[in-house]
């Protein structure tokens, strides 16, 4: 399935499904479905221990997905109201007409995502990528950054074979020797490193002009109908993020937190602790600034979304770029959390 076909499939029922949810599904918020992924995040402990439910007063149905593209497909169908996604599928989905709002910035480009090349592939430096077979999850930030990296090197998909396949398939193909490398996040990142090395990180590619982020988004209808839910949800994320930053020892490989993450997400507690150390996190006060969620048209996130969309159009992955992406970003929840914390 091509990138464009996948996006069209994701969004084919988006307008009708979101409108239906807004009309009949969000009145009481007695049930909320939240999509998450396998990334190691401090707040995922709150999925495991039920603190999100307690804080919001809602029995949340948490569902795990393999990628942001899958989450946007579920949002478009009306099955999911809140989700954790990356900036590339976010830009693609909104460019196609899906109306969602980023209300919490989970992380920005760091070393938690990277291009790993296989031992024996003949790749020692970026100059060795020509003629190789690489992969990334479809419609993901990794896919976007892999293409952006190749462009910065003067290479195209004619020079390097790029496969857009799910992460489990990347790991399997890499281990068989069918792939020379993959741009991935955990747990695939740790799996690939067992027989390879990191060639370049997400942070490295961001510094070359292709920044990315991961964020929590909600459908526009849900965000308007349930601001208190989003505030409480964001408050839990901020609480666990602050705990991790203030006392990293409580999040080490032998900690209960790391064990909880491993139980929820897979891998070992040591894997999860290592993943946490690689995150690039921002406090809510910084998130609320114009550099990120605040500022309307000046919003840093809105600018990244547009820059990403422009690149995706150049690569013929989407057909349209919107004049502005400011409508898909809101600082309301993080501002409320900041005021509530007194910070």
Residue locations for each model-derived region?
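Sec/Tat-exported extracytoplasmic proteins
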Residues: 56, 79, 84, 94, ...
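Bacterial N-terminal signal peptides that target proteins for export
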Residues: 1-13
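Short, glycine-/small- and polar/acidic-enriched structural segments
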Residues: 29-156, 161-169, 173, 180-186, ...
């Amino acid at each position: 399935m091509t990138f464009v076909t996948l996006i069209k499939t994701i969004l084919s029922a988006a307008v009708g499904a979101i409108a239906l949810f807004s009309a009949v599904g969000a009145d009481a918020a007695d049930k909320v479905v939240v999509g998450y992924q396998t990334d190691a995040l401090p707040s995922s402990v709150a999925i495991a221990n039920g603190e999100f439910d307690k804080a919001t007063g809602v029995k949340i149905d948490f569902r795990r997905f393999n990628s942001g593209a899958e989450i946007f497909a579920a949002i478009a169908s009306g099955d999911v109201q809140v989700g954790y996604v990356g900036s590339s599928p976010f830009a693609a989905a909104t460019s196609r007409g899906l109306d969602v709002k980023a209300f919490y910035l989970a992380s920005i480009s760091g070393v938690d995502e990277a291009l790993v090349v296989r031992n024996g592939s003949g790749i020692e430096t970026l100059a060795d990528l020509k003629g190789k077979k690489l992969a990334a999850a479809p419609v993901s930030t990794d896919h976007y950054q892999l293409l952006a990296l190749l462009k910065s090197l003067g290479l195209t998909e004619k020079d390097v074979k790029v496969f857009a396949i799910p992460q489990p398939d990347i790991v399997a193909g890499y281990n068989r020797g069918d792939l020379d490398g993959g741009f991935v996040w955990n747990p695939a990142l740790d799996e690939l490193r067992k027989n390879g090395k990191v060639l370049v990180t997400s942070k490295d590619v961001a510094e070359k002009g292709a920044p990315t982020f991961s964020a929590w988004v909600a459908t526009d209808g849900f965000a308007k109908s349930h601001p208190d839910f989003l505030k409480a949800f964001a408050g839990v994320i901020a609480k666990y993020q602050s705990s991790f930053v203030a006392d990293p020892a409580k999040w080490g490989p032998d900690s209960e937190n790391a064990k909880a993450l491993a139980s929820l997400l897979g891998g070992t507690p040591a894997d999860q602790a290592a993943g946490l150390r690689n995150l690039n996190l921002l406090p809510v006060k910084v998130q609320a600034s114009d550099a990120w969620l605040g500022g309307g048209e000046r919003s840093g996130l809105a600018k990244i979304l547009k820059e990403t969309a422009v690149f995706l159009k150049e690569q013929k992955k989407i057909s349209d770029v919107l004049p502005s992406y400011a409508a898909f970003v809101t600082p309301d929840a993080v501002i409320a959390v900041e005021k509530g914390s007194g910070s």
